[in-house]
Amino acid sequence: MERHYYTYLIKEEFANHYFGRESVMFELFQDYHWTSLEKQQYEMTEKQIQYITQPIPILHMHQRLKMNLNKTDYRQLDYIYRIALPKAKGHATFMMKEHMIEIVASGDYEAETIFFEVLRKVSPCFLAMDFNSKRYGWLNPVKERNFV
């Protein structure tokens, strides 16, 4: 079964605030991507998402991907990277957009894990969501800060 992850870089202040309450963010993004909202409601949801997210650092991502994928059999076409595991055990496609990264994978989880590991090294504030299976979470959990 194919897995489709929508991955956003959340601004640190919101990542800290919503740590442990990711379901609230999941519902917001799910409404945005998977629900037929009325135009006004869609525009409001889009503004909320723009407010809590930051653009993907495209150049930095290219550098990190190339550095970390050098021992992996991968192909690249512009903003798209594709990994195919040996013996057809699985594959994953990584598509960078201005405000989101989509990862589509099937077979073993190893291929998408390679991409998630790269994202973890870039920022602890990436939130990945698979709306079909209702799975979501921080790629590198944001540590709760204790204020005295």
UniProtKB/Swiss-Prot annotation:
Does Cell membrane count among this protein's keywords? no
This protein's GO cellular component annotations are: cytoplasm
Which Gene3D superfamilies does the UniProt record give?
Sporulation inhibitor of replication protein SirA
Q: What induces it?
A: Up-regulated by spo0A. Expressed during sporulation, commencing between 90 and 120 minutes after sporulation induction in about 20% of the cells (at protein level).
Name of the protein this chain belongs to: Sporulation inhibitor of replication protein SirA
Which gene name belongs to this protein?
Answer: sirA
User: What binding partners and quaternary form does the record give?
Assistant: Interacts with DnaA. Forms a 1:1 complex with domain I of DnaA.
Known outcome of mutating Y18A: No longer localizes to mid-cell during sporulation, not toxic in growing cells, 2.5-fold reduced interaction with domain I of DnaA in E.coli
| Cellular localization per UniProt | Cytoplasm
